């Protein structure tokens, strides 16, 4: 049986409009939730994006 991959995929969700705008990958051993300030095309401004499951 194959080993489990160390890379997991997740989406970045806008905190203002709750749209999933970006999809990223990270190492499974990194336990902290990722928070990035990125551009939201729906809000038309830079907002805080937090990690959420796909």
Curated annotation (Swiss-Prot):
Record has Ribonucleoprotein as a keyword: yes
Pfam families in UniProt: Ribosomal_L33 (PF00471)
Protein name: Large ribosomal subunit protein bL33
Organism superkingdom: Bacteria
Family that this chain belongs to: Belongs to the bacterial ribosomal protein bL33 family.
The keyword Isomerase is annotated on this UniProt entry: no
GO biological process: translation
Any one Gene Ontology cellular component term annotated for this protein: cytoplasm
Keyword terms, alphabetized: Ribonucleoprotein, Ribosomal protein
Gene Ontology MF term list: structural constituent of ribosome
